[in-house]
């Protein structure tokens, strides 16, 4: 593992040598989310803040912090043969993402992978987990971008482990 980390740092240092940021953008974004938590479908709406850096070699990276909330289609949550007795169909989330990818067409289109950490309240049960995914951002103007992201998480809660999957579509207002 140590050799892998040292190798990755060496390669990234060589690739990013003499590379500078051509553009750094901050954004505020709104998202509509369709998700599945513990095998129960949910609808959510979210808001977030992010920073994206476009390098002159077309590498794109960014971080974002998001909050979302919504409702589950069913209030009976079953995780590892334990059923929640709470009559609560609420869902709320807070998370952070790291994005790394490639920007095309003068930074109008960004394709990226996502690594994510997440906290979730699902029907009165708290959970946390790590996840991964992929996304696409398309800037329709200098200040407006549309995006689509898919993420999947392995969550751990006091009731046991469960999966959380989400696909989101959003609009971003970007500024420097």
Which functions belong to the PLM regions below?
Residues 56-61, 106-111, 138, 142-148, ...:
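Repeated loop/turn-to-beta-strand initiation elements of outer-membrane beta-barrel proteins
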Residues 1-25:
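Cleavable N-terminal export/targeting peptides
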Residues 51-53, 67, 98-104, 138, ...:
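Residue-level signature of outer-membrane beta-barrel architecture
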Residues 19-59, 67, 119, 174-176:
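Short glycine/proline- and aromatic-enriched beta-strand/turn motifs that initiate or cap beta-hairpins
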Residues 43-49, 92-98, 130-134, 165-169:
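Hydrophobic, lipid-facing positions within transmembrane beta-strands of outer-membrane proteins
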Residues 138, 163-176:
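Outer-membrane beta-barrel "beta-signal"
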Residues 26-32, 63-65, 96-98, 111-115, ...:
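Membrane-embedded beta-strand positions of outer-membrane beta-barrel proteins
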Residues 34-40, 68-92, 117-128, 154-165:
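Flexible, solvent-exposed loop segments that connect beta-strands
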